Each structure stands twice: as structure tokens, then as C-alpha cells.
């Protein structure tokens, strides 16, 4: 049972998700408190491998009003993701050879109340693919509503 703290809905629209992974995330105490209060935004966030380590970039975690004025971390600071070395090497190989991208899908609390990040290997969609996906989604909605009317 996990509780989503933040979701990146735009990632499902902009990318074709190929494979998902779970990673730990290194946060400060005030950032965890802000996440629990729902003050996170993963829109336009992505994951990069820098010097053999995974970092979540461009994720916005705004601080709470109760945070000490002397300790206000940068809201868009890069945050280190924690994974096993073999997994990082596997991701690096796929990103460098296949031209894939790593995006953050969600931040959530696991069963032990530890913040985890759900990241994905994804391939960018072009405009035609996005339009096709929207048409298919609308067709599915219409089909469901038609079934509800007659059942």
C-alpha cells in the first residue's frame, strides 16, 4: 500500500513508458514534511546520470511556511536518487545506446513511510503519436459510456 505524494501526469502524455523502476531519494527533513503536505510538482522533471549517480532534476518541492528562515533549501535543487550500482549501469547502457530518456513518474510513501521515487525509461512521443493517443482515449470513453447506457 503506497500513498502518492506527487505525480507527473504530463510524462504519460509526452513519453511512451517502456520500463519502471523504484528508487530511494535523499531529502532533507523539511522537504519530506513539505512532500507530505502536498507541496511537490514533478512537471518537466527528469532523471540524469551524473558521475555514476542518479539525480532527479527540475523537480519543485516548495518549502513550508514553518520552515526556519535560515534553512530554506533551493526548491529546484537536484536530488540524489538511490539505486543499486547494477541498476544504474543497466539504465546508463539503455539511455546511452538506445536514445531513451529517464523521467520521474511519482513520489510516494512505501509501507515503511519512506519516500520513494518511481522513475521510468521512456521514449519521447512525436506530435502524431500524441494526437493518436488522445483519439484512442476519447474512443474508449465513448465506448464505455455507450455500454453504460445499454446495460
Curated annotation (Swiss-Prot):
Keyword flag Cytoplasm: yes
Cell location: Cytoplasm
Predominant subcellular localization, coarse grouping: cytoplasm
Superkingdom to which the source organism belongs: Bacteria
Keyword Phosphoprotein: no
Any one GO MF annotation of this record: RNA binding
Disulfide-bond pairs as recorded: none
SUPFAM superfamilies: Small protein B (SmpB) (SSF74982)
Cited function: Required for rescue of stalled ribosomes mediated by trans-translation. Binds to transfer-messenger RNA (tmRNA), required for stable association of tmRNA with ribosomes. tmRNA and SmpB together mimic tRNA shape, replacing the anticodon stem-loop with SmpB. tmRNA is encoded by the ssrA gene; the 2 termini fold to resemble tRNA(Ala) and it encodes a 'tag peptide', a short internal open reading frame. During trans-translation Ala-aminoacylated tmRNA acts like a tRNA, entering the A-site of stalled ribosomes, displacing the stalled mRNA.
PANTHER family: SSRA-BINDING PROTEIN (PTHR30308:SF2), TMRNA-BINDING COMPONENT OF TRANS-TRANSLATION TAGGING COMPLEX (PTHR30308)
Name the record gives this protein: SsrA-binding protein
Amino acid at each position: 500500500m503506497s500513498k502518492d505524494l506527487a505525480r507527473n501526469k504530463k510524462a504519460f502524455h509526452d513519453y511512451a513508458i517502456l520500463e519502471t523502476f523504484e528508487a530511494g531519494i535523499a531529502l532533507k527533513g523539511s522537504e519530506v514534511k513539505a512532500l507530505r503536505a502536498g507541496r511537490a510538482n514533478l512537471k518537466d522533471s527528469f532523471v540524469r546520470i551524473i558521475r555514476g549517480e542518479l539525480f532527479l532534476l527540475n523537480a519543485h518541492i516548495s518549502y513550508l511556511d514553518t520552515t526556519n528562515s535560515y534553512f530554506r533549501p533551493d526548491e529546484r535543487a537536484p536530488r540524489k536518487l538511490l539505486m543499486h550500482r547494477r541498476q544504474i549501469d543497466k539504465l546508463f547502457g539503455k539511455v546511452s545506446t538506445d536514445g531513451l530518456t529517464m523521467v520521474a513518474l511519482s513520489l510516494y510513501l512505501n509501507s515503511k513511510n519512506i519516500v520513494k521515487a518511481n522513475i521510468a525509461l521512456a521514449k519521447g512521443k512525436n506530435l502524431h503519436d500524441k494526437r493518436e493517443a488522445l483519439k484512442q482515449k476519447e474512443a474508449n470513453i465513448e465506448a464505455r459510456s455507450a455500454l453504460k447506457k445499454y446495460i
